Amino acid sequence: MLTRDGAGRILRARWPPLVALTATLAYAVVVIGFGLDFRPLHNDEGVTLGVASRASAIDVLRVAVEHRHGPPLHYLLVHASLAWRYDILGLRLPSAVLGIVAVAVSYGFGRELVGRGGGAIVAVVTASSPITIHLGQFARGYTAMIAAAYASAWLMLVLIRTGKARWVGPYAVTALLLVSAHPFGLFALFSELVLMAIFAAVRLRHGLRGQRRLAAAVVAALVLGGLALLLLRHLYSPLQGKYGVGSGTSVIKLGSARFWERFGDAASGSTHAGFGVALAVATVLGVAALAVRNRRAAIFAAVWLVLPLVLLSVLTASSRDFAPERHLSFLLPGYAVAMAGFALELRARAGARFGGLVAAAAVAVLLAPGWVADHNELSDFNADLRDASLYMADRFGPDDVLATTSGTLSQAEDPRLVGAYAVLAAPSSSPLASWQHAGPVRGCKLVRRIGQRRAPVGTVWLVMSVPDPRPVAQSLRTAGADVRGFGTFLVASAIPRQPTVISALLTAHYLFHTAVEADPSAYDVRRMVRLYRHAAAVDASGECSR
């Protein structure tokens, strides 16, 4: 029979893996259970959907490599998920699952570097980071990069410690996955190869006698890792022209207060500079403490955090698309190790009796702003768009058309992709599920997209998001449309005068114009007025049939 003392001994002996397991399960629940199915699509998710929804994996790989020059691993994973279920969950599930994998693997990585207690702290930091929470909810390759960074770093450390050749193959695979997940994985892998060379040099500083197997394993791992780096560097090289690499200013200005403010806000989860500064101080102190007690961990954290920043400060690019909260997410292993070093040092200095409580309290205080940010993000969603999509899907006929979606959404959310969301949310039995949404196309492409059914046009459907939907809905009803509101989203439908494409275009133009007259501040809807007027004109001229 398990007694209280026995249970206490078990908890004291096994608390690190239990904490890591709790962190992993908590991350899984909050990411998958809160809003994964409801949020509008981000700009980049449209690219992911366009590539990953190709007919076959070979076609996905071809488009990813030859046309997008993007991360093939991410597109292939999303393709497999969409083959399982073609909906919003299928689109975003790989990112969520790989975020869960990242948290789980982070414990093993941390245990290898800073012990069982440190591994638990690494898992908690990874699971509760606002960066990890945010990136796990959207269909991009960042969580794949984080998970692969943890896995490859863990295998690299095991390889150096054991010197066994059996770890070379698994390491090479994870290194390839790291650079296949995202272009910025190149910086993570380069740091990893530098660390491998440093750790191997330390092990071999007294000569090769008795360590030839270690030397051979390290050389093989370095060669294979280097080949993965060069291979994906070649794949991503066309992106240099897109982002103006080699011209413009530094990607990162280390002396820029704006960069550190934005990076600190993302890491801490708060716009108050003091919280970001506190995390930075704890990180530096953690590395300093590790330099005294665990030099291997100190070297890892220092190189992993500093080397990529130095490289990116030297690299120049004219593009303004760099976002530290996403592109530098691969720094998470170094940051988590430094935080673990800080907590372990506090525990050691506070003594055996209260050290654990002091360390836990300090970590909780440092991570609290991030937890608040996590709560705010996870609670900031509603089912309005999904309800609107299901309402339309239930009534969408086989000859109906969905016009370009428009309106005002949150930052980085694309109103043109509301149509893509509606198609993904529609049950397979609804004709809406097979509709190819208009997206951002215009002119003759828009004409062909509206006429894709090649049949007499039935009802024209519009979905728009406006700040004040009541007057817009009333005006649309007065104009003869059927309107249903879902929060700020309006679903409007009307039958064109004639069952032709040009009549459908003119009907959509009229409804958009009516909405703008009711709410002149709906600037994106105003764009649709011009877009559909032009499409109707080019269709009437016969230009699109040539």
Specify the residue positions occupied by each region the protein language model found.
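Intrinsically disordered, low-complexity regulatory regions of eukaryotic regulatory proteins
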Residues: 3, 42-43, 537
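Membrane-proximal helix-loop-helix interfaces that form the catalytic/acceptor-binding platform
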Residues: 13-527, 544
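Short, Lys/Arg-rich, polar N-terminal cytosolic tail immediately upstream
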Residues: 1-13
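Short, low-complexity, Pro/Ser/Thr/Gly-rich segments in the mature regions of secreted, periplasmic
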Residues: 529-545
